[in-house]
């Protein structure tokens, strides 16, 4: 059995399994309705007393449970709500009081409407509500994402930080700008020494950078750097996609992002076209380790190019 926070060797080589989940990243509601979720299993991993990670078919979920109720980070897809709640009930039968959306993408917020109708309070950064409130177009995937229904929208929003005090834990939520999107937040479970990064961290493969909605390679690097400042050698890190990680894995990920930026930027500065930059294969030395996820190297280089052109 793999050590749950071992992320080298075999763990990174099974990333294709997690790529299946990440491949749903930009699913629209209509696509979700057509997909068969019947065989998806929600797996719970205990990190510390009262803190768990749930994995299924969307972004990894973080859970704080205890006498004060359930605090949940993200809710994957609407058809999985009952399975997610059943998995949580096995941990603790208390009601889900809060859902914190890490960002606006549908594989992290798809269960919002179901949760909102159950009386759960949905919380997110200001930009998450703004983006979810209107139709959006993701040109990188040629996907139109319709505005979310009212019940799915965050009812409490913040512009920088907010803190929850639940279950004997301090849950510090902080916005990191212009990273994966323009509305990303991470959650630090202070006493438990756990961090939920959301899609600021794709563990083991190239990330999607939604530069069309405020994301950037520069912001991703800066955001990961901020998380590394508070992580210690024993910190358990829940990524947006991929297996449970540690500080060393997050540091390796940041090194990769910097190498890609440093490979693409001189070409952008020299006035090369997007196709020229992609043809130059600036990620070639990294592709064996990072290029086996849902976003292939050429697509990732294209996103980095677009980010650096701004």
Predicted regions and their residues:
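Bacterial N-terminal signal peptides that target proteins for export
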Residues: 2-19
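Metallo-beta-lactamase
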Residues: 35, 46, 69-70, 77-79, 129-176, 181-182, ...
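Conserved beta-strand hairpin/beta-sheet module of binuclear metal-dependent hydrolase folds
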Residues: 43-88, 187-189, 194-197
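Accessory terminal helices/loops
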Residues: 21, 25-35, 229-231, 243-310
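Active-site metal-binding motif and surrounding structural segment of the metallo-beta-lactamase
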Residues: 44, 67-71, 79-123
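Short N-terminal segments immediately surrounding and downstream of signal-peptide cleavage
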Residues: 30-49
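Divalent metal-coordination and catalytic microenvironments
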Residues: 50, 64, 74, 88, ...
């Amino acid at each position: 059995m793999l050590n749950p926070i071992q992320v080298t060797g075999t763990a990174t080589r099974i990333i294709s399994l997690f790529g299946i989940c990440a491949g749903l990243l930009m699913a629209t509601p209509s696509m979700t309705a057509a997909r068969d979720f019947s065989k998806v299993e929600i797996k719970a991993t205990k990190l510390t007393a009262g803190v768990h990670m749930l994995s299924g078919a969307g972004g990894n979920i973080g859970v704080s449970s205890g006498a004060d109720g359930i605090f949940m980070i993200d809710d994957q897809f609407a058809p999985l709500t009952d399975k997610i709640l059943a998995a949580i009930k096995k941990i603790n039968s208390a009601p889900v009081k809060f859902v914190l959306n890490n960002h606006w993408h549908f594989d992290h917020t798809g269960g919002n409407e179901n949760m909102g109708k159950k009386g759960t309070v949905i919380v997110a950064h200001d930009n998450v509500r703004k983006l979810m409130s209107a139709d959006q177009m993701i040109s990188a995937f040629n996907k139109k994402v319709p505005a979310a229904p009212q019940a799915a929208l965050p009812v409490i929003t913040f512009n920088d930080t907010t803190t929850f005090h639940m279950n004997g834990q301090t849950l510090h939520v902080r916005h990191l700008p212009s990273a994966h999107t323009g509305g990303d937040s991470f959650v630090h479970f202070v006493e438990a020494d756990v961090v939920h990064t959301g899609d600021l961290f794709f563990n083991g493969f190239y990330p999607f950078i939604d530069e069309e909605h405020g994301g950037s390679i520069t912001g991703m690097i800066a955001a990961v750097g901020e998380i590394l400042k508070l992580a210690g050698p024993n910190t358990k890190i829940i990524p947006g996609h991929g297996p449970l990680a540690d500080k060393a894995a997050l540091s390796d990920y940041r090194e990769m992002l910097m190498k890609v930026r440093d490979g693409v930027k001189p070409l952008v500065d020299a006035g090369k076209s997007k196709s020229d930059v992609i043809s130059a294969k600036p990620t070639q030395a990294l592709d064996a380790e990072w290029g086996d996820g849902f976003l292939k190297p050429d697509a990732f280089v294209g996103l980095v190019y677009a980010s650096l052109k701004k």
